[in-house]
C-alpha cells in the first residue's frame, strides 16, 4: 500500500471520492502501521507513534469481550448507540494498543478513540479478564482525525442470527449498516 499506484488509488478513494476504510484485527494492524490511523494518511511510524503489539499475557486470545462506543464521530459508528456496550468476539495474539500518555490524551481529546474494552458495568478497565490484550487506556478501536478510517481489534463482522446465540448482550454495532448509510 506504500507503492505509488496504491497510494494514488487510496488517495482517490479517501480524498476525491469521500470514501471510507475499515480495518478489523489484522486490518487494524495494517492501518496503524501505514499511519491511516491515527494520522489519516500514509506516513512512516516514528518511535512515539501508537502501535499494536503482543498481548500482555504473551499469547493468543479468543473470546467474547465487552466494548463500549466512546464516540460516534466516525461514519462507521453512526448507527451504534453512543455509550452502548456491545459483546464482540476477539481472536488475536498481537492486539494490544500501545501509545504514550500524550498520544492517548490527544486521541481522546480529538474524539478518535472509537471503542474501549469495558467490564460488565460499562467501565473501561485494565483488568485482563475484560481488556484481554492489555491495551493502554482500554482502547479497542481508533479512527483517523475525520473518522472515515476506523481500525478496531474486535470482530464486529462475526454476527448473524445463528451466531453466538448463547452469548448475552447486543452483538451488532451496526458498522456495515452505518457504512452503507454514509453513501446514501
Predicted features along the sequence, with ranges:
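Single conserved hydrophobic/aromatic residue that forms the stacking wall/gate
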Residues: 1-9
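Short secondary-structure boundary/capping segments
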Residues: 35-40, 167-168
Amino acid at each position: 500500500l506504500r507503492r505509488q499506484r496504491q497510494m494514488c488509488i487510496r488517495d482517490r478513494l479517501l480524498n476525491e471520492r469521500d470514501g471510507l476504510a475499515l480495518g478489523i484485527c489484522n486490518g487494524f494492524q495494517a492501518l496503524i502501521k501505514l499511519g491511516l490511523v491515527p494520522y489519516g494518511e500514509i506516513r512512516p511510524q516514528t518511535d512515539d507513534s501508537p502501535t499494536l503489539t503482543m498481548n500482555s499475557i504473551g499469547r493468543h486470545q479468543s473470546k467474547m469481550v465487552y466494548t463500549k462506543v466512546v464516540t460516534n464521530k466516525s461514519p462507521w459508528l453512526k448507527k451504534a448507540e453512543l455509550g452502548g456496550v456491545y459483546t464482540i468476539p476477539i481472536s488475536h495474539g498481537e492486539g494490544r494498543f500501545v501509545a504514550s500518555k500524550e498520544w492517548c490524551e490527544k486521541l481522546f481529546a480529538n474524539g478518535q478513540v472509537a471503542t474501549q474494552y469495558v467490564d460488565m458495568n460499562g467501565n473501561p478497565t485494565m483488568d485482563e479478564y475484560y481488556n484481554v490484550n492489555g491495551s493502554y487506556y482500554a482502547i479497542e478501536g481508533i479512527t483517523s482525525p475525520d473518522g472515515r478510517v476506523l481500525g478496531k481489534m474486535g470482530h464486529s463482522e462475526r454476527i448473524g442470527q445463528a451466531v453466538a446465540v448463547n452469548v448475552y448482550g447486543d452483538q451488532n454495532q451496526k458498522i456495515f449498516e452505518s457504512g452503507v448509510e454514509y453513501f446514501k
